[in-house]
Amino acid sequence: FSGPKYNDYCMNYTIDLTSKIFPNCEIIVSTNDRNLASAVANNPLVNKLIISDNIGELPSLKYPENSSKIINNNINKQNVCCLKGVLAASHNIVLRIRTDQVLLNNNILKIWDLSKNFPSPLGRKGKIITSSIFSINPRYSERMPYHISDMLQFGYKDDIISYFSVPNYPFEYATWYERNPHIEYSNKLERTFRSKFAVEQWLTLHYIFNKEENFPIRFHNDFNDRIIDDFENNFIDYFIIAHPKDIGLRAPKFKDAESYYSTQCYSTFEVFKLLENKYPNTKITSTNFTAKGMNKKYFNKLMPIIYSPFAQFLIKRLSTENKNRIKRILNHLAK
């Protein structure tokens, strides 16, 4: 587990649950939050407690709508905690997960077994399983290739060490669009970015291409049909993206985003479909899983309406109650 202490519940409960779901596992808590360290220090199930210095955050990834919505870019301090925790692991297979998330079953092991049926790229021992939450499909409203979720990793220790062994994100990149214009075709969502890349892109691009000079994209929404096709052909050799429902992932902080990540992010079904197309001789098929989110045929027709300036103008002026009502409807449609 890596991250800070959350007030939602005591983390000792998720530690206990994890030890039951994965018998004989080694539990490591890696944090820069002294309050969390104190809360779990006496838990006999915690095999290793790693406390790092808080190296601070960068300016917010996106331009906030107002001062109360500032969420600073924590990529560098996140990587310190994650990497130290993974390096300390004694086992060859590692699950790295946020402190506010937990797996409620061991279904991830079934997907892990399925992933072994497909080849791995040179220099990698296997694939890393991650979640759909913000593993963005760039064919929809946010055209950002290589934006694969950084919230959870399950895979070989050496691969996850490589994933987090990236250069520090530069301050110049964190403030990129303060000095550089967004590319002309950027939509409203893409123009909210202050940072040159998303955190998820910085990690994924380095993991796949090793050095920035090899990156196939120049900035967060650098895309065209060829870039997207290459992205989908590449990432499936390195990652399996799994929908939370397929791996029993509890992520309450992102419950309101369920309709978004179920419809506009990659699901287990879609990833195995891509693998099936690339490796047609394998016996594993996408029929092991079900499609998530709204029917893409209908969503493609709805999306231009939902994201039109007039619709966004109206939505912004709705009361919080009505906005939440719309979210509930979309979440229901996305089930």
Where are these regions (language model features)?
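Membrane-proximal basic amphipathic "stem/tether" segments
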Residues: 261-335
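Short, well-formed alpha-helical segments that are part of the catalytic scaffolds
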Residues: 6-21
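Hydrophobic targeting segments
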Residues: 1, 26-29
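Soluble or luminal CAZymes and related metallo-dependent hydrolases
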Residues: 6-10, 73-81, 195-199
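Active-site acidic Asp-centered loop
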Residues: 97-99
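Active-site-proximal specificity loops/subdomain of glycosyltransferases
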Residues: 30-88
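Catalytic core and acceptor-binding pocket of nucleotide-sugar-dependent glycosyltransferases
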Residues: 103-110, 115-269
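Short aromatic/hydrophobic "clamp" motif used to bind/position activated sugar donors
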Residues: 94
